[in-house]
């Protein structure tokens, strides 16, 4: 769902 996308984006940002 949308929340899963948000979590994924947050994970990518955290990886930076």
Swiss-Prot record:
Secreted recorded as keyword: yes
The organism's place on the tree of life at top rank: Eukaryota
Record bears the keyword Secreted: yes
InterPro entries: Aurein_antimicrobial_peptide
Tissue specificity remark: Expressed by the dorsal and submental skin glands.
Range of residues in the leader sequence: none
One Pfam family named in its UniProt record: Antimicrobial20
Keywords, alphabetical: Amidation, Amphibian defense peptide, Antibiotic, Antimicrobial, Immunity, Innate immunity, Secreted
GO biological process, one term: innate immune response
GO CC annotations, alphabetized: extracellular region
Modified sites of kind Leucine amide: 16
Compartment(s) of residence: Secreted
Function field: Bacteriostatic action for Gram-positive bacteria. Strongly inhibits the formation of NO by neuronal nitric oxide synthase (nNOS) at micromolar concentrations. Acts by a non-competitive mechanism, probably by binding to calcium/calmodulin and as a consequence blocking calmodulin attachment to nNOS.
Protein name, entry field: Citropin-1.1
Organism this protein belongs to: Ranoidea citropa (Australian Blue Mountains tree frog)
Phylogenetic classification of the source organism: Eukaryota, Metazoa, Chordata, Craniata, Vertebrata
């Amino acid at each position: 769902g949308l929340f899963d996308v948000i979590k994924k984006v947050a994970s990518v940002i955290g990886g930076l």
